Each structure stands twice: as structure tokens, then as C-alpha cells.
Amino acid sequence: MNTLHPHKQQQEQAQQQEEARYEWDLSLSTVVSSSSSSASDVIGAIEFDPTDNIVATAGISRKIRFYGLPSLLRNNAVSGTGVSFVDQATACEYYICTPAKLSSLRWRPGSGGRVIGSGDYDGVVMEYDLEKRTPVFERDEHGGRRVWSVDYTRHGGASTVGASGSDDGTMQVWDPRCPPEESVGVVRPAGICRSAVCCVEFDPSGGPAVAVGCADRKGYVYDIRKLVDPALTLQGHTKTVSYVRFLDGGTVVTAGTDGCLKLWSVEDGRVIRTYEGHVNNRNFVGLSVWRNGALFGCGSENNRVFVYDRRWGKPVWVDGFEPVGMNSGSDKRFVSSVCWRQSGVDQCTLVAGGSDGVLQVYVGKRKP
């Protein structure tokens, strides 16, 4: 129990007892799908570039695809039907072929949106120059074990220091300016258990913290200036912690395959709130935080997109993926990735990807 801020805790408890209020009008704007009847193309990662105008996606297709958000929304405006259906080949501005299936993407800070990093199923971290459309950096230090997550820190101006989490049970911290054989640090959150590191994220506000989600059912927060031991252990999930995201410098959101999200205080490690409603028992379904609106988006194994407001434990908005194409007959489809556009205050954009390769763009605005 947090005795330092009793008034704040009382406010949180009162909000938990309130009924969730629907303060946002969210609607489906654009659906991007392929006319090909080829095998499933799971979208495992979605990222906006620093301008918030380019969307990159990746997954098992061995391609990083790039879309212009304004053109996707423009298609919707032209159609006049409420929802615009666009073929992937037309909507995709360009793509880069990769040597392996990808699990994660992240734009490298300080590159002007020119360099994007990726983690793949073969245990390799690569960076690509988008102007040349060629790889410019490669690290193979996870022993061939799948890399689940990559991220970069903005702390202290060291914008090129990155980290990767892998099935090998480690978080590797590295600097792309240094030779591949050199490492800033190696962290084993679960110790000798070597449980998979499923997610890593640095504090996007520039603080010295890096959060880690592990298959040992715990989350961890480290100070990058002292990586020997975690500054905080987040214990409360009953299954794998698949995602961890900073809401701000003082709170972290985790997702677990126990079917819930949890909001934590970085100050003392207590659970502020638990969020339930979506279905997640096995797969990676995505987690994204819109910091300006304090909204969390995640996918679900019932093929729906869920949005939670930090103030309430039940979803404030739910929408199902529309069946598209020849793959729509499968009852095993699920929403596999989500990403909020960070710009805006009273308007928002959420992009979600499915296990069938379908990309859906949602737009919303705050109700008067």
C-alpha cells in the first residue's frame, strides 16, 4: 500500500468503482488487405515514424512495408462510403525484403526517420537505411534464438544505444556505432531460469529507465546506468508478460497471456489497476499506449481490437476485424499488433494488424 500519496490512491479507487465512460468516437476508416490467396501473413509489428505520417509493418512475410497515413485516410475521404477498402499492392508505397521473419520494429532516434531497426526469428538485430533500402547494421548475439523486441534510448542524448530481448533469456544492450562484437551490457532478468525476454522498452520521455517483460510472469524495470540488478520487479501476472509500455515517467503498462493488462507505479511497484475484457491466452496480440489521451490499445484472440482508458478496468471501446478475402473462413484469426499515432490531443489514430495480414486504420475524436 502506498502511504505517500493517500489522496491519489483514494481517487484511483473511486475511479475503479465508476462505470467506464465512452468519451471517444472511434470508427474504422481504412482496411488494407491483399487480393492474393497465399498463406497467412501475420503482422507482428506496426510502428509510426517520427513524423507520425509513415506507418511501417512487418511479420512473417519477410518484408517491411511502408504506408503513407495521409494517403490511406485520403482514400477514405474519396470513397464516401464510411470505410475505404484498399489493396495492399496499391496502398504500400514501398517495401524492403528481409532475410528472416520479423517480430519487431523501431525507428532509430536521431536518424531523421531514415533508419529503422528490426529483430527477427533468427536472433539477428538489423538496421536498414530507408533511402538506400539496404541493411547498414547487423548484430547476431542471441545464439540464433528469436529476438522478440528492439528499442532505443533517448536518455542523456545517447539516442543510438539500443536493446534487444530474446528467447535466449537475455536483454542485450548495444551501440550501433561500435563493432558488433562489443556490447554495452547483458542482462538476464530471470537469472539462471533463462526465461524468454518478450519485450524491452526505454522510457520514451528520456528518463534512465528500461522496462522488460519476461516469460517468468514478471516485469522488471532497470536503470540503464546500473544494469546489474533491477530497480523494480513487477509481480502480479499469472502467465507470460508479453508486452511492457511506459505511459509516462511514473507508470508502466504490462500485458500478459493471462488475459489482462496492468498499470504499475514505477515509484513503488504497486499495481494501480488491472484491465480485463480482451482474450489473450497464447498469442502475442499487441499493446500500444497513446500518452496524450491515456488510452491503451490491444488486440485479442477473438479477432477484436480493445481500447482501455487508464481510469477504468473495463474496455471503453471494442471493434471486430471485418472478414476480408479468402482467409476469412478461419476461426483462428486474431488481432496480432496495434500502434497508436502519438500526435494529437482531441483526435487520435489507431492502426491494427491481424494474423491474416489485414491492416485496419481507426480514427477518433473526443466527444464534446
UniProtKB/Swiss-Prot annotation:
Pfam families from the UniProt entry: WD40
Keywords, alphabetical: Cytoplasm, Flowering, Nucleus, Repeat, WD repeat
Consequence of gene disruption: Small stunted leaves and early flowering under short days conditions.
Record localization: Nucleus; Cytoplasm, Cytosol
WD repeats: 38-77, 97-138, 141-184, 192-232, 236-276, 279-318, 330-368
UniProt-listed GO biological process terms: chloroplast organization; flower development; regulation of protein-containing complex assembly; response to UV-B
Gene3D superfamilies: YVTN repeat-like/Quinoprotein amine dehydrogenase (2.130.10.10)
Keyword Nucleus attached: yes
Primary location class: nucleus
Any one cellular-component term (Gene Ontology): cytosol
SMART domains linked to this entry: WD40 (SM00320)
Stated induction or repression of this protein's expression: Circadian-regulation. Expression increases during the dark phase with a peak at the beginning of the light phase and then decreases to reach the lowest expression at the end of the light phase. Induced by UV-B.
Purpose of the protein: Functions in association with RUP1 as repressor of UV-B-induced photomorphogenesis mediated by UVR8 and HY5. Plays a crucial negative feedback regulatory role downstream of UVR8-COP1 to inhibit UVR8 function, balance UV-B-specific responses and ensure normal plant growth. Is involved in the regulation of photoperiodic flowering and vegetative development. May act as negative regulator of photoperiodic flowering by suppressing flowering through the action of CONSTANS (CO) and FLOWERING LOCUS T (FT).
Subunit structure: Interacts with UVR8.
Protein name, UniProt field: WD repeat-containing protein RUP2
Organism from which the protein derives: Arabidopsis thaliana (Mouse-ear cress)
Lineage: Eukaryota, Viridiplantae, Streptophyta, Embryophyta, Tracheophyta
